[in-house]
């Protein structure tokens, strides 16, 4: 873990150390007894450098969205710390978080649930500005028009309601809202997963353009490696609340080390029929174990074809295997 | 009437397409106008006693005539005038009682649903307690202890009928508060109060409005039954409920239908009309259509 910290520490914008988010499971009518813990996020370490896009990949239920929300303190973390610049977010009260909320924003997956259906667009986009009393009523219209232009929407439509827009347009509204406070760090929680394929590329390009223009840093959460490959600089692969591998995008695709990463990569279709026919998929056996009853040792050991005795007994730590490459696997270490 | 293409604009269009709802609304409006302009419509004062001509006896139980459109009641008062003025009292009681129950129910439902945990537990147990109150018994005891007044009826109905609103609002809040736009508002640092008022309340207003109409109909029925039993609106103030009191006498019930049929019918009509409006609203607000 110490190794992760020392890499270009000066350039780090946000770092997560030993982050755990556990949800107690209770049962009973009168006296609610705790019968177990869902370890949604179970000890994460990573750092995100200024101006980069950090991809976080994993299948559904592995805790990627929980991680994103815990960083913004929308979900309280159980353990660990989150440093933004030099401030520990987990130790702050919601009141102390207020000024930092300008810097840290979020884009949501479902563009139908992330916009208040009773508010016209002008109110949706200006809401954060009003919450931070950053604009007066007279400036509102100009500022919203400016933001709408930035994300490629026609400001003429600012008095319309969300249901009058398409999915892609709604996602643009969500992006405009997250940019309203001049955010520096944006958690993109599967921002294109709910969109049509034809629209996905547009939104991805928009996100990249804005990043270049405004110097943003993204935590890009996705379950689709091909999307992450396009947008990310570095990628972390998550499995059952833990990171199993972190490395640069190129390295990950050329030299995946963790068996789980290899499995994920083999599932990515290739846009060339000749090569696609030759693609061999690694099929893992069984299902993802329930986060209520995680296997002992390495979380992937129950499905890994190369699992040895040690894998089932001891949990591998995230270790540096080469420059800029960390893997949590006994096989590699 | 509403901002173009807003949720309420669509709902309005759907509502006006529903014939039954529009008829219900028209009937309700008719009674509201009747209540508002009671002094202009009623030929007599509601509590004016009439005497048999040339004699010093009340002209009671007089059959309908051109002088008394719906005859007179057991004290020689004009039934039609009492019916018109009764609309005022009945509607005032119902609307004020519903206002009380809606405010209490909405506030408690919002707090309960939004904050959850111990607050939710306390409020929901309170709801259980209030639901198990024997309303009639409670009112009879209150009216024997205190001087009966119309305000006691209003507050009594209001304080026992907020529970369904509270449960409804709580359930709606639980649904809405997990949506992403609430998370987005929290990520911007919006205060709890603002989230509740600006993001949650506007999105649960539709079911509350349906609940208000249905609650009004139920309050009218409640007032009628309380007044019929003599613990509601007291004489000489006319209400549709206490006008039915005369029907407790077998003689009236059997031989003088003009005394009890009109208040009974208007009561039925108004309640039915309001229910139709409520149904229409519910369909209009259902955006799945």
What kind of region is each of these model predictions?
Chain B
Residues 172-181, 280-288:
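Transmembrane helix boundary and interhelical loop/hinge segments in multi-pass membrane proteins
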Residues 69, 73, 100-105, 110-175, ...:
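Generic hydrophobic transmembrane alpha-helix motif, especially the helices
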Residues 1-102, 106, 110-111, 117-118, ...:
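Gly/Trp-centered helix-boundary motif
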Residues 143-145, 157, 173, 222-266:
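Glycine-rich helix-loop "coupling/hinge" segments at transmembrane-helix boundaries
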Residues 88-104, 193-225, 274:
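Transmembrane alpha-helices
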Residues 31, 110, 139-144, 153, ...:
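Transmembrane alpha-helix boundary and packing residues in multipass membrane permease domains
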Residues 82-84, 126, 169, 173, ...:
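Short hydrophobic alpha-helical segments within the ABC transporter permease transmembrane module
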């Amino acid at each position: 873990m110490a190794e992760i910290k020392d890499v270009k520490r000066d350039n780090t914008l946000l770092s997560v150390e030993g982050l755990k988010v556990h949800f107690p499971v209770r049962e009973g009518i009168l006296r609610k007894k705790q019968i177990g813990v869902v370890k949604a996020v179970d000890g994460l370490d990573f750092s995100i450098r200024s101006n980069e896009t950090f991809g976080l990949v994993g299948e559904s239920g592995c805790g990627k969205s929980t991680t994103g929300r815990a960083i913004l303190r929308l979900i309280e973390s159980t353990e660990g710390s989150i440093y933004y610049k030099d401030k520990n977010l987990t130790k702050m009260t919601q009141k102390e978080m207020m000024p930092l909320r300008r810097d840290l924003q979020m884009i949501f997956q479902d563009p139908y649930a992330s916009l208040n259906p009773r508010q016209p667009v002008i109110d949706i986009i200006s809401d954060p500005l009003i919450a931070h009393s950053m604009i007066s009523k007279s400036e509102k219209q100009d500022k919203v028009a400016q933001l709408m232009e930035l994300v490629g929407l026609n400001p003429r439509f600012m008095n319309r309601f969300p249901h009058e827009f398409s999915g892609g347009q709604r996602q643009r509204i969500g992006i405009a809202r997250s940019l309203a406070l001049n955010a520096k760090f944006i958690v993109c929680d599967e921002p294109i997963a709910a969109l049509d394929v034809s629209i996905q590329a547009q939104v991805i390009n928009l996100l990249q353009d804005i990043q270049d223009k405004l110097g943003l840093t993204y935590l890009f959460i996705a379950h689709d490696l091909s999307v992450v490959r396009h947008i990310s600089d570095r990628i972390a692969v998550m499995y059952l609340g833990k990171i199993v591998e972190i490395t640069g995008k190129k390295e990950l695709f050329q030299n995946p080390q963790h068996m789980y990463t290899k499995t994920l990569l083999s599932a990515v279709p290739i846009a060339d029929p000749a090569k696609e026919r030759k693609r061999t998929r690694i099929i893992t056996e069984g299902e993802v174990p329930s986060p209520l009853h995680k296997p002992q040792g390495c979380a992937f050991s129950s499905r890994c074809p190369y699992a040895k005795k040690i894998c089932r007994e001891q949990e591998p730590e995230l270790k540096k295997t080469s420059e800029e490459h960390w893997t949590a696997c006994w096989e590699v270490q | 009437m509403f901002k173009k293409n807003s949720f309420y604009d669509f709902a309005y269009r759907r509502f006006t397409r529903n014939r039954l709802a529009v008829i219900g609304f028209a009937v309700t409006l008719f009674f509201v106008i009747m209540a508002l302009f009671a002094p202009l419509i009623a030929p007599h004062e509601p509590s004016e006693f009439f005497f048999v001509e040339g004699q010093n006896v009340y002209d009671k139980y007089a059959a309908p005539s051109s002088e008394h459109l719906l005859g007179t009641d057991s004290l020689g008062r004009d039934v039609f005038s009492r019916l018109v003025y009764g609309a005022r009292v009945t509607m005032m009681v119902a609307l004020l009682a519903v206002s009380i129950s809606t405010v209490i129910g909405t506030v408690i439902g919002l707090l309960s649903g939004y904050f959850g945990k111990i607050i939710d537990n306390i409020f929901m147990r309170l709801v259980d307690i209030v639901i198990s109150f024997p309303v009639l018994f409670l009112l009879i005891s209150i009216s024997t202890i205190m001087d009966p007044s119309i305000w006691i009826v209003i507050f009594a109905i209001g304080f026992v009928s907020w529970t369904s609103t509270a449960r409804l609002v709580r359930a709606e809040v639980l649904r809405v508060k997990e949506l992403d736009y609430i998370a987005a508002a929290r990520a911007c640092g919006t205060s709890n109060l603002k989230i509740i008022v600006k993001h949650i309340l506007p999105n649960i207003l539709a079911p509350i409005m349906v609940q208000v109409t249905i609650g009004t109909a139920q309050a009218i029925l409640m007032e009628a039954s309380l007044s019929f039993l003599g613990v509601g609106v007291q004489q000489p103030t006319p209400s549709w409920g206490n006008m039915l009191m005369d029907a407790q006498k077998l003689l009236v019930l059997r031989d003088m239908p003009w005394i009890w049929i009109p208040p009974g019918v208007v009561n039925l009509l108004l309640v039915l009309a309001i229910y139709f409006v409520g149904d229409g609203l519910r369909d209009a607000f259902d955006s799945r259509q």
